[in-house]
Amino acid sequence: MDTRFHCVYLLTSLDPQCAGEYYIGYTVDPIRRLRQHNGEIVSGAWRTKRRGRPWELLCCVSGFGEDRIALKFEWCWQHPTKSTRLKTQMTQLRGVHRLPYAVGVLHLLLRADLFARLQLTLHIFEPERVGRVVAELQGRVPSISPLVATSLLRIEEITKERFMSLYLDGVSGDGTAGDGCVYFVTAPLSSQPDVDAPSRRVRSCRYLSEEDVFRQHARVKELLEANQCPCALCSLPLRSPYFVRCYRTPFCALRAHLACLAMWFTYETMQKRDVTMGQSTRNERSGEYSNKIKDDSNDGTMDAHASGRQLHSLSVNNADFSSSRDAGSILDSSGHISAFEESRCASSPSLTLLPCQPCPCPLCDEPLQWGALVHDLKRRAVLEKRWMERQRREKIEAALAERLQRLQNSSLTERKSRRKATPALGQKRNRGEYCGDTVGDGGKEAVTNWRARAMDGCDSWNDTNDFSHSVSLPPSRDEGYACDSSRRGVGGSKHTTRMTDEGKNDSITDICDCVLQLTEFNLDEWLDA
């Protein structure tokens, strides 16, 4: 389980002789990597060491769940003309070079179908420099619109110090972790914790070392395999991999059924709508009463005592409304449906189980996107299915190889035993001996009769009943084989052996065909749906 911070960064040269030069790379610690490129510490890139120092970190893209996806993003950013996702759009950047070209490719890459479905974050460390480059890009290519924050893409302007404290440092309370250690990853928060926020945020966001993460992952894996890992919402057991999880895993322990989380999304949407409608209704009623009081005071028909009673009635009405609203009552004093509930029922659309808006996580309050959660579920389900089918095929192939080896060993042993039972060439058999066995008196008489009929010109192959019935013990398989071998000589032995091997090969081929028919599978490519 990979728990590191994966990001793809963009560097630009501060050397006036290399103005506009850029470098794109992948790392788990962009601040430490910047020091390596500038030569402060060892293990820098050869390209940045040769020319262009000092380098400046402009931005980086994070939010990749594993290094494979981050490396794919890096390759597409470095080779946009070879990428199948960008090569058809690269005509828009014709005539754009150097740093504006890299920024333009980033704009196109973040809008590609593959990466637009991920919850990514664009960290901008030099907003002024990036703003000038984007303005230059807009002047040359007006068709490329600037990046804006969406439900899946988050854009933040941040300093290197705050970036270190939020994403890379291992500071928890008064304790400090190793300097530059990427295995101490913090749990980033979208905003500062509120004093009135529930304790679930504090309980979910904590600093974990690599050993703790591996230990927790192993424990959860054991529970999932035993069907004992409970759902975070309904406490019923989960079945791997058909469950959804927070994108901040392993820093958030949310693991729930798909239907449970969908109902949570619907519940949160209804709560937000009720709060918004209640606030707007209270504002409207307060405005009506204030306007009425103002009109009465302007006319001069209301004295101080009357105005006091009006204000008192206003406060009482507002208190009654809030209390009835908290109690969940939908009836007014006369027993009819209140105007607020009537307007709510009339304006509220039909609720569906499929969420359409982002919702905060039940444990860490981070915004969750339903499309990203389902995409992650489909990806894990396809990988799990492929892994199980691969294991099944390997087991079948191992069983077939073992059976084939056993058949070969048995055929070799049988050949050796047959060679021992076959009489040598030129060896004389005793009279009355048939294929190594002594023929009885009835057999001798049958042989004599057969020879007499052959001398008379009779067809020996059409009349063999006397011989077949008179022989006391028919020869066995080995004896018959030995007899045929002794009669035909070496050529007959080779022909018989070849026929036997062909029969065995045919049987093994039939077995393989039958078994391989069972291993044929058709993957449900959910990712292409």
Curated annotation (Swiss-Prot):
Gene3D superfamilies xref list: GIY-YIG endonuclease
Entry's localization field: Nucleus
Membrane spanning stretches: none
Presence of the UniProt keyword Membrane in the record: no
Pfam families registered for this protein in UniProt: GIY-YIG
Biased composition (Basic and acidic residues): 282-297
Disulfide bond positions: none
First-tier enzyme category under EC: hydrolase
Cofactor: a divalent metal cation
Chief place where the protein resides: nucleus
GO molecular function: 5'-flap endonuclease activity; zinc ion binding
Gene Ontology biological process terms from the UniProt entry: DNA recombination; DNA repair
Region listing for Disordered, in residue ranges: 275-305, 409-437, 470-501
Domain of life of the native organism: Eukaryota
Zinc finger (SLX1-type) in chain: 231-364
UniProt keywords, alphabetically: DNA damage, DNA recombination, DNA repair, Endonuclease, Hydrolase, Metal-binding, Nuclease, Nucleus, Zinc, Zinc-finger
Keyword Nuclease: yes
InterPro entries cross-referenced by the UniProt entry: GIY-YIG_endonuc, GIY-YIG_endonuc_sf, Slx1, SLX1_endonuclease
Cellular component aspect of the GO annotation: Slx1-Slx4 complex
EC number: 3.1.-.-
Residue span, GIY-YIG domain: 4-89
Family annotation (HAMAP family): Endonuc_su_Slx1
Purpose of the protein: Catalytic subunit of a heterodimeric structure-specific endonuclease that resolves DNA secondary structures generated during DNA repair and recombination. Has endonuclease activity towards branched DNA substrates, introducing single-strand cuts in duplex DNA close to junctions with ss-DNA.
Subunit and partners: Forms a heterodimer with a member of the SLX4 family.
Family that this chain belongs to: Belongs to the SLX1 family.
Protein name: Structure-specific endonuclease subunit SLX1 homolog 1
Native organism: Trypanosoma cruzi (strain CL Brener)
